[in-house]
From Swiss-Prot:
Keywords: Cytoplasm, Decarboxylase, Lyase, Porphyrin biosynthesis. It comes from Listeria monocytogenes serotype 4b (strain CLIP80459). It is found in: Cytoplasm. This is Uroporphyrinogen decarboxylase. PROSITE patterns: UROD_1, UROD_2. It comes from the Bacteria. It holds the Pfam family URO-D.
């Protein structure tokens, strides 16, 4: 395995002292990069993610181009679902479309056992290739969290209100629990397999869970998240686990009492406020990605965020959501350099090391 010479991200995830703030970006690989767009002229998303050499190249591009302190595996949260019998298609301009949506207990019962080594060997081969030969920064693996996956599976695709998902959850609580159990087991096995293959950390993306109240989260979702984290930690107790959601600040107190290591927040929550709600966790975030299209505002906001981030150990600079396709790659490089240089000055000034 290639030696990790830049471990700033891992130190921050463990709330250790650093000399500068680590930075990486959700969706840093892919859509905004001309090299990726050129690949997409020849290959589909399916073809890219199923060819380890190409997928590893795409994953590594931001490390080489922007100088970020971590790589995140290039793939989709839908990747494992076909291994459970879900007929999913990624449609351009729409997103994931499920051709056999969940409507009943019988549909949930049909979901099959997921074995990563059998169903997604190309994912594990990509990780091994990156970890063994290509990266000197940590590699982050990830999975979609059960609520977000279930919302696609029940709605049949993207949704603005998740009415079908929530009504199914309320109307069929026992069937919902079975669905969560199946998705939870799949997610735990998937994350464990990624760590076994060489990832240094893993992130749970629960993109749409902010649609739930805290009470509903505690009743319908928390048990499965606890199970996932518990099972991963039982095998890999020192591997950082990140929880990332959007519009979910009201759930921070739930995550504080779980054995998570890092909590991602978006621009609706300040770093200072988040720290008060999750004092034992490292914080990741929280620049609004829209500012990347307004350079002056972007750097101003980045400085404001850093002023809060450097006050305590355990901070990782990121966005509150993913990079837009319209973002110029040079802006991400400029921002990365700014974060590194500015945070080093601030840390020396405040003598926080």
């Amino acid at each position: 395995m290639t030696k990790i010479t830049n471990d700033l991200f891992l130190k921050a995830a463990r709330k250790e002292q650093v000399d500068r703030i680590p930075v990486w970006y959700m969706r840093q690989a892919g859509r905004s990069q001309p090299e990726y767009r050129k690949l997409k002229e020849k290959y589909s998303l399916f073809e890219i993610t199923h060819q380890p050499e190409i997928c590893a190249y795409v994953t590594k591009l931001p490390v080489d181009q922007y100088g970020v302190d971590a790589a995140i595996l290039y793939k989709d949260i839908m990747t494992p679902l076909p291994g459970m019998g879900v007929d999913v298609e990624i449609k351009s301009g729409i997103g994931p479309v499920i051709h056999n949506p969940i409507r009943s207990f019988q549909d949930v019962e049909k979901l099959t056992m997921f074995k990563p080594e059998i169903e997604v060997p190309y994912v594990l081969d990509t990780i091994k290739l990156l970890a063994d030969d290509m990266l000197d920064v940590p590699l982050i693996g990830f999975a979609g969290a059960p609520f977000t996956l279930a919302s696609y599976m029940i709605e049949g695709g993207p949704s603005k209100n998740y009415h079908q998902t929530k009504s199914f959850m309320y109307r069929e609580p026992e069937v919902w629990a079975i669905l969560m159990e199946k998705l939870g087991r799949m997610t735990a096995n998937y994350l464990i397999a990624q760590i076994n293959a060489g990832t240094s950390a893993v992130q749970l993306f629960d993109s749409w869970v902010g649609a739930l109240s805290r009470a509903d989260y505690a009743e319908y979702i928390r048990p499965v998240i606890e199970m996932i984290v518990r099972e991963v930690k039982a095998v890999h107790p020192t591997t950082p686990i990140i929880m990332q959601a959007v519009g979910a600040s009201h759930l921070l107190a739930e995550w504080e009492t779980m054995p998570l290591d890092v909590v991602g927040v978006d621009w609706r929550e300040t770093i200072t406020s988040a720290r008060k709600k999750v004092p034992t966790k490292a914080i990741q975030g929280n620049l609004d990605p829209s500012t990347l299209l307004a350079p002056e505002k972007c750097l101003k906001e980045a400085n404001r965020i850093l002023q809060e981030g450097v006050l305590e150990p355990g901070y990782i600079f990121n966005l509150g959501h993913g990079v837009f396709p319209e973002v110029p790659p040079e802006m991400l490089k400029k921002l990365t350099n700014y974060i590194h240089e500015r945070s080093e000055i601030l840390l020396k000034k405040d003598d926080i090391k």
